[in-house]
């Protein structure tokens, strides 16, 4: 065994032993209404909270009914009947007198005053609170959903603008070498054969993630093959008489992924995602409408053949003998250069054919495809306008989300007090009634154990700490323009960047930019001279209103920034240099909010069970974490250890941050690791000491640094070819006549426009040959290698 392996085993062994010694009691985990009914979709938790209040109200109604029946159906009729009876002799008279006196020991007026009326008043108050909460939460949730849909539509609007600009680039790029603007550099199907807009890696659901377009298309083909098609009695004109019910689609999805979340919210979300991507369309006369319908399990849909035919056409490309107009054919026997020319030719013809189908038919196959300066300026303004709308909708969505969360929290907090009052009132009325009954019986009615209120079953409700939907992360599209003095034109490119809050960290470049922003915030926290403020900020719950304001301020800086790289780290540094209105508690809250908004927790959720079983230490599991997670964990571990050393705090201070959860609603450990589905809040007993041991261990930073260095050393650097450049001419180029293809012959002869050459030397940045088509492209579209 090497010295390195021996040291690693020592670290893992010490970590396991220390975490077991630091186990916390159940009493230190506060489970209340404020941290019980939280779900990522909000509506499930709200419904369970309403159900909980109704159940409490039912307890009051039951006891009220019992006292009412006891008085009106039993005790009063008994007394009345005794008084009506006539004695036949002195013995009967004496017996009736004794019994009447004994029964009068329990006064019906006292039972109603001491037992029934207090519960009735509490019931009325509870029902009033219930109605108010139900209406208010419903209103807040409706506003949130409305803003969520508006933000999603604004995002789609931006993507369509970018997509329309990008599609123009197809006339200048071979199909084999083009890659989608939305694939983050991953290999995917060519955009010329893809009609939906999404980013890869693409997350359809927490259980359905796809690394590239091929994987996604393969999944869709499998799903399509399993969904049973039906024939309608009355077919829709213009569509084939084959459709399927939305319920059938969800059923087959569940078979493909048994752990799929089948809440109504999630089902509707997945269905709407399919509709928005153009994978399915409603089988009805709305086919002729431009309005996008909402998914409904009871409605019928049909597969979009234009999208799903992609995989089939790719698979059968080698067997096709006859090519149709605008299609790309592959032949292993053809020369490589000839294939490339064919690719360019067919891509151009395909683009012209699609453009000719638009409402504006000014440009046809024989017309000019040049774009002058004014046309490009108009497209750019349209994209900027769409981005302004998207930014506004994202800010509104953040506001409505915080208002919804604050409303849920306030009602849960207030009802928690009411619930205690209900419990005390029920116990008091039971005790009063028991005392009155014991006077009548002259003996104890029941033991103290039997007098306890009925307990709720363990699985009655979902229990879990705060969860936040990461919503729709804001992104922007930077338009880069560079002048070409030789050709008197501009080179245009488009680059996309995401705001760090709510965005995934699995993309290396985006993760490094986010890491830079997080580092700046942590350094800002470490400037705080008061150690108690730093410790209390990490211990307290998030002040969502102030932190949301800080987040929106940073979002505004991100939107208005003119930088094109590392924007998150640059705007964060600039913001805190000039703004002093936020305190340490706000900065720590922003870090916590960022952790909660990650699509997957910083410690990947698929290792949650491994940590709960405590069979492996967190350090040993780090070898299986993504490199981006290791970088952030290293930075946070370094931060906690720096706090400990800088302020000369006792060793147990950082441990207490994780272990003492008695006076907070969101345990600190919950920010770092969360289960994808339901989780038992008592798991915090294991997770808290595990994380505290991990972060305070002096060898953790060194271990993580070694793992990161090994990943960088072994990683292979992909060689990327220079993407094609697009040109925006300052003046309109002369029109070159090109013969139109015969109307009934899709294989008609196509003559490409002549290329022009530059007298300047050839360089990678300025190739000598440039296409005669002056069209904008996206620099993110790196040809696949």
UniProtKB/Swiss-Prot annotation:
Residues 313-340, 732-785 are annotated as: Disordered. GO terms for biological process: establishment of cell polarity; establishment or maintenance of cell polarity; septin ring organization; small GTPase-mediated signal transduction. The modification Phosphoserine is found at residue 759. InterPro entries: Rho_GTPase_activation_prot, RhoGAP_dom. The keyword Repeat does not apply. Residues 520-702 form the Rho-GAP domain. Residues 329-339 have a biased composition (Basic and acidic residues). Coiled coil: none annotated. This is Rho-GTPase-activating protein RGD3. It comes from Saccharomyces cerevisiae (strain ATCC 204508 / S288c). The gene is RGD3.
């Amino acid at each position: 065994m090497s010295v390195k392996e021996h040291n690693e085993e020592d670290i893992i062994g010490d970590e396991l032993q220390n975490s077991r010694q630091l186990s916390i009691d159940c009493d230190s985990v506060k489970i209340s209404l404020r941290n019980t009914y939280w779900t990522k979709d909000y509506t499930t938790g709200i419904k369970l909270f309403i159900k909980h209040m109704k159940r409490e109200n039912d307890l009051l109604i039951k006891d009220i009914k019992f006292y009412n029946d006891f008085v009106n159906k039993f005790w009063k009729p008994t007394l009345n009947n005794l008084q009506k009876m006539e004695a036949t002799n002195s013995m009967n008279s004496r017996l009736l007198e004794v019994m009447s006196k004994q029964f009068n020991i329990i006064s019906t007026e006292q039972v109603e005053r001491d037992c029934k009326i207090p519960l009735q008043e509490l019931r009325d108050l509870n029902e009033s609170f219930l109605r108010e909460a139900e209406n208010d939460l419903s209103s807040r949730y409706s506003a949130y959903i409305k803003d969520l849909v508006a933000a999603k539509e604004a995002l789609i609007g931006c993507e369509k603008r970018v997509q329309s600009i990008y599609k123009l680039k197809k006339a200048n790029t071979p199909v084999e070498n083009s890659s989608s603007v939305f694939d983050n550099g991953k290999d995917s199907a060519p955009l010329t054969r893809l009609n939906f807009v999404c980013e890869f890696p693409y997350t359809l659901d927490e259980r359905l993630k796809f690394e590239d377009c091929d994987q996604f298309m393969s999944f869709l083909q499998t799903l399509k093959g399993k969904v049973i098609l039906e024939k309608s009695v009355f077919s829709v004109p213009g569509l084939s008489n084959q459709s399927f019910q939305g319920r059938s689609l969800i059923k087959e999805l569940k078979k493909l992924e048994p752990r799929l979340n089948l809440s109504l919210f999630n089902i509707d979300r997945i269905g709407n995602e399919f509709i928005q991507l153009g994978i399915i369309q409603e089988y009805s006369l709305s086919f002729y409408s431009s309005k996008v319908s909402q998914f409904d399990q009871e409605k019928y849909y049909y597969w979009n053949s234009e999208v799903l035919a992609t995989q089939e056409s790719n698979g059968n490309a080698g067997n096709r003998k006859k090519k149709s107009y605008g299609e790309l054919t592959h032949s292993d026997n053809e020369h490589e250069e000839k294939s490339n020319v064919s690719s360019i030719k067919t891509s151009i013809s395909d683009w012209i054919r699609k453009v000719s189908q638009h409402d504006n038919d000014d440009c046809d196959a024989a017309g000019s495809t040049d774009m002058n300066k004014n046309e490009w300026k108009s497209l750019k303004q349209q994209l900027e306008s769409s981005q302004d709308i998207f930014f506004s909708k994202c800010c509104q969505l953040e506001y409505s989300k915080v208002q919804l969360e604050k409303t849920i929290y306030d009602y849960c907090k207030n009802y928690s007090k009411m619930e205690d009052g209900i419990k005390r009132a029920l116990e008091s009325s039971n005790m009063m009634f028991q005392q009155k009954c014991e006077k009548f019986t002259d003996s104890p009615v029941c033991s103290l154990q039997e007098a306890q209120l009925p307990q709720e079953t363990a699985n009655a409700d979902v229990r879990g700490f705060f969860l936040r939907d990461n919503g729709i992360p804001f992104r922007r599209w930077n338009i880069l323009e560079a002048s070409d003095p030789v050709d008197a034109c501009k080179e245009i490119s488009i680059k996309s960047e995401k705001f760090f809050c709510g965005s995934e960290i699995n993309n290396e470049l985006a993760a490094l930019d986010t890491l830079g922003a997080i580092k700046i915030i942590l350094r800002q926290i470490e400037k705080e001279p008061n150690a108690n403020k730093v410790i209390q900020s990490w211990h307290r719950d998030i002040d969502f209103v102030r932190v949301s304001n800080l987040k929106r301020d940073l979002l505004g800086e991100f939107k208005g920034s003119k930088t094109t790289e590392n924007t998150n780290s640059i705007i964060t540094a600039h913001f805190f240099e000039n703004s002093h209105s936020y305190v340490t508690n706000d900065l720590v809250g922003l870090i916590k909010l960022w952790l909660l908004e990650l699509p997957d927790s910083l410690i990947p959720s698929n290792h949650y069970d491994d940590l709960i079983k405590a069979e492996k230490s967190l350090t040993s599991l780090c070898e299986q974490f993504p490199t981006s997670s290791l970088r952030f964990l290293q930075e946070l571990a370094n931060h906690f250890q720096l706090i400990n050393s800088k302020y000369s705090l006792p060793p147990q201070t950082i441990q207490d941050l994780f272990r003492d959860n008695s006076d907070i609603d969101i345990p600190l450990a919950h920010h770092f690791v969360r289960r994808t589905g339901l989780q038992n809040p008592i798991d915090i007993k294991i997770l808290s000491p595990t994380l505290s041991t991990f972060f305070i261990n002096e060898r953790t930073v060194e271990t993580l640094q070694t793992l990161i260095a090994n990943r960088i050393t072994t990683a292979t650097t992909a060689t990327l070819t220079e993407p094609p450049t697009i040109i925006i001419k300052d003046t309109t180029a002369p029109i070159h006549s090109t013969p139109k293809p015969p109307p009934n012959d899709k294989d008609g002869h196509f003559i490409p426009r002549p290329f022009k050459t530059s007298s300047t030397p050839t360089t990678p940045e300025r190739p000598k040959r440039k296409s005669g088509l002056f069209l904008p492209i996206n620099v993110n579209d790196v040809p696949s290698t």
